[in-house]
């Protein structure tokens, strides 16, 4: 029997590709393709969906996630914009409901490997900054991938970074800080998704860069998440935990 899936945000560029990918997969059946005006909770009840893949917007992803879990479906969240307190609340709710779920800041397997490699490098380089770039339709900054990368690096590095007595002549020139790691966000035409993690040491730098040049690079990760989520009874933050 095929797994019943709703794609929320089905009319967007990612949503269209996700529908195409999942429809052509023998394990899955798409039972609804939803957009902003549709009633997500009622659709879950009507279709008896087991999984909801959310590819919507940062301004509604938290409420969507609550709706999915409270209606007994398993969330596969590919929308950025969730902050740490919201992720904590969703984690607790999944524990109470004994429902598995996945929040994936990035579905690209290459991006996940970039994050893993950066985490390893942070054991040896304490000085690091992140430069992320996306298309101009991405309204939240920094990206979920950059935030997750900073969290992984902060948890792994063995000594704090140097405290520099700098004065910003233009406010924000040094970027934003997350877990004491500076993040710089670019929003430019011609970009899809790009991230560089730049480490510095005495006499050397190390750059780990990933470029997404076609949204199809995210599809294997969506398939993997949908395959794995039914076997979970907790919320997983980051696709790296499923590899």
From Swiss-Prot:
<dbReference type="InterPro" id="IPR022663">
    <property type="entry name" value="DapB_C"/>
</dbReference>
<keyword id="KW-0560">Oxidoreductase</keyword>
<feature type="active site" description="Proton donor/acceptor">
    <location>
        <position position="134"/>
    </location>
</feature>
<dbReference type="InterPro" id="IPR023940">
    <property type="entry name" value="DHDPR_bac"/>
</dbReference>
<feature type="active site" description="Proton donor">
    <location>
        <position position="138"/>
    </location>
</feature>
<feature type="binding site">
    <location>
        <begin position="9"/>
        <end position="14"/>
    </location>
    <ligand>
        <name>NAD(+)</name>
    </ligand>
</feature>
<dbReference type="GO" id="GO:0009089">
    <property type="term" value="P:lysine biosynthetic process via diaminopimelate"/>
</dbReference>
<dbReference type="InterPro" id="IPR022664">
    <property type="entry name" value="DapB_N_CS"/>
</dbReference>
<dbReference type="InterPro" id="IPR000846">
    <property type="entry name" value="DapB_N"/>
</dbReference>
<dbReference type="GO" id="GO:0050661">
    <property type="term" value="F:NADP binding"/>
</dbReference>
<feature type="binding site">
    <location>
        <begin position="104"/>
        <end position="107"/>
    </location>
    <ligand>
        <name>NAD(+)</name>
    </ligand>
</feature>
<keyword id="KW-0220">Diaminopimelate biosynthesis</keyword>
<dbReference type="Pfam" id="PF05173">
    <property type="entry name" value="DapB_C"/>
</dbReference>
<dbReference type="GO" id="GO:0051287">
    <property type="term" value="F:NAD binding"/>
</dbReference>
<dbReference type="GO" id="GO:0008839">
    <property type="term" value="F:4-hydroxy-tetrahydrodipicolinate reductase"/>
</dbReference>
<dbReference type="GO" id="GO:0005829">
    <property type="term" value="C:cytosol"/>
</dbReference>
<protein>
    <recommendedName>
        <fullName>4-hydroxy-tetrahydrodipicolinate reductase</fullName>
        <ecNumber>1.17.1.8</ecNumber>
    </recommendedName>
</protein>
<dbReference type="GO" id="GO:0016726">
    <property type="term" value="F:oxidoreductase activity, acting on CH or CH2 groups, NAD or NADP as acceptor"/>
</dbReference>
<keyword id="KW-0028">Amino-acid biosynthesis</keyword>
<comment type="similarity">
    <text>Belongs to the DapB family.</text>
</comment>
<feature type="binding site">
    <location>
        <position position="135"/>
    </location>
    <ligand>
        <name>(S)-2,3,4,5-tetrahydrodipicolinate</name>
    </ligand>
</feature>
<dbReference type="InterPro" id="IPR036291">
    <property type="entry name" value="NAD(P)-bd_dom_sf"/>
</dbReference>
<keyword id="KW-0457">Lysine biosynthesis</keyword>
<dbReference type="GO" id="GO:0019877">
    <property type="term" value="P:diaminopimelate biosynthetic process"/>
</dbReference>
<keyword id="KW-0521">NADP</keyword>
<feature type="binding site">
    <location>
        <begin position="78"/>
        <end position="80"/>
    </location>
    <ligand>
        <name>NAD(+)</name>
    </ligand>
</feature>
<keyword id="KW-0963">Cytoplasm</keyword>
<dbReference type="Pfam" id="PF01113">
    <property type="entry name" value="DapB_N"/>
</dbReference>
<feature type="binding site">
    <location>
        <begin position="144"/>
        <end position="145"/>
    </location>
    <ligand>
        <name>(S)-2,3,4,5-tetrahydrodipicolinate</name>
    </ligand>
</feature>
<comment type="function">
    <text>Catalyzes the conversion of 4-hydroxy-tetrahydrodipicolinate (HTPA) to tetrahydrodipicolinate.</text>
</comment>
<keyword id="KW-0520">NAD</keyword>
<comment type="pathway">
    <text>Amino-acid biosynthesis; L-lysine biosynthesis via DAP pathway; (S)-tetrahydrodipicolinate from L-aspartate: step 4/4.</text>
</comment>
